[in-house]
Amino acid sequence: MMITIRPDEISSIIREQIEQYNNEIQVVNMGTVLQVGDGIARIHGLYEVMAGELVEFEDSTVGIALNLETQNVGVVLMGDGLTIKEGSFVKTTGKIAQIPVSDAFLGRIVNALAQPIDGRGPIPASEFRLIESPAPGIVSRRSVYEPLQTGLIAIDSMIPIGRGQRELIIGDRQTGKTAVATDTILNQKGQNVVCVYVAIGQKASSVAQVVNMLRERSAMEYTIVVVEPADSPATLQYLAPYTGTALAEYFMYKKKHTLIIYDDLSKQAQAYRQMSLLLRRPPGREAYPGDVFYLHSRLLERAAKLNSQLGEGSITALPIVETQAGDVSAYIPTNVISITDGQIFLSSDLFNAGIRPAINVGLSVSRVGSAAQIKAMKQVAGKLKLELAQTAELEAFAQFASDLDKGTQDQLARGQRLRESLKQPQSTPLTVEEQIATIFTGTNGYLDRFDIREVKKFLDQLREYLKKKKPQFGEIIRTTKIFTEEAEALLREAIKEQTELFVVQQKN
């Protein structure tokens, strides 16, 4: 059987093929590896690469182009890079580092690339944010005016923190810096605040401890944990705080309040120093590169209180910095102190003396001040800092004076009881009304009759008594936010009744 060839059919097929032909040329910017090691690769031939652009190696390892030089490009690797060889190919991606963001991140543990590391499967996300995005401008902000309660009496009364503030937590190792931060997370329960805890270069066991504590106290429901432990590449330790901030910004621009904790920025600076020295950038003071101030300022400036047009969302930042032997004048501590709106100084001497949280009230300051306090707290805690400072001065004087007059002895005794009333066990944050009751009791001399060892027990019982027998007191403070005459009368009555009960208990 003869096959009849129809020329018109063939020509129509050819015409169709020509129409569908796509003659686009895909240009991929390629380079070759000159040298690789210590988490750094030098690449030749990567022309037109952007600063901070992601580049991809043959083995799918991703890196960031940080040093753009005339002959080559210095790339920091976001992985171990063990299979990258000299001469292997590298291509540009045309992307700047970005991460997926969504509400589904709440309750999850992720790494610096926002990939889940808690074994609970992928996190759905439809949106992306740049890891390094610009901070809100002056016009986009408003001044800090709402308190962010930490639940710690010493902080909320004397070093108040407001929503949108940056407050540094600084102190030697093992002085309870992380405890102050985690207690603040616990106190945000029911306050509609999203918390982000960024652990940089910490031991995996310490991070696991924090996560378990947050889980036990049902705080993981509103918390995201970003972890890059001590064995992570320096690049990822350097990126982790920016990743945490990008996640917090997602919620801030959705009109929510967020709290972010960087634990700690000393480790991030060390990771950045390591990267910079390996990239052969000139070292400066303490061998840190010249732009280490910019490293932290561009991070912390992203914490803000947005204006009403943008929805009044906020990011409150609590960066942690570790000092060596209490030296606040080292490079990183002075840098971060000058960037933040105040600092909480934790002293190892106070910690060892059993004063916990070990806050040195004399050296700690909040530059937002009473703008971040409710009126009731201002009314009660106004003289507290002054009284404690006078007590410290008197104690120094009393070491040299043999006999003190009655007035001085009374003032010393009251100061010691006040200091005792500020002690608080870890993971037991107090509500504002409980704090107000505690401070009022101390500053008005109601604790003077008790032995120092009885103060804690009495205050615990008083707070319980107020909750059960005088719930109106807490109601007044919560609704009016003012320490009214009625609230004062209720509190004085409760103190009187509880004192009588306590005295009877002690006798029995």
Curated annotation (Swiss-Prot):
UniProt membrane topology term: Peripheral membrane protein
Family label: Belongs to the ATPase alpha/beta chains family.
Localisation: Plastid, Chloroplast thylakoid membrane
GO cellular component: chloroplast thylakoid membrane; proton-transporting ATP synthase complex
HAMAP family named among the record's database cross-references: ATP_synth_alpha_bact
Protein known as: ATP synthase subunit alpha, chloroplastic
Domain of life where this protein originates: Eukaryota
Catalytic activity: ATP + H2O + 4 H(+)(in) = ADP + phosphate + 5 H(+)(out)
Keyword annotations: ATP synthesis, ATP-binding, CF(1), Chloroplast, Hydrogen ion transport, Ion transport, Membrane, Nucleotide-binding, Plastid, Thylakoid, Translocase, Transport
Principal localisation: plastid
Species for this entry: Gnetum parvifolium (Small-leaved jointfir)
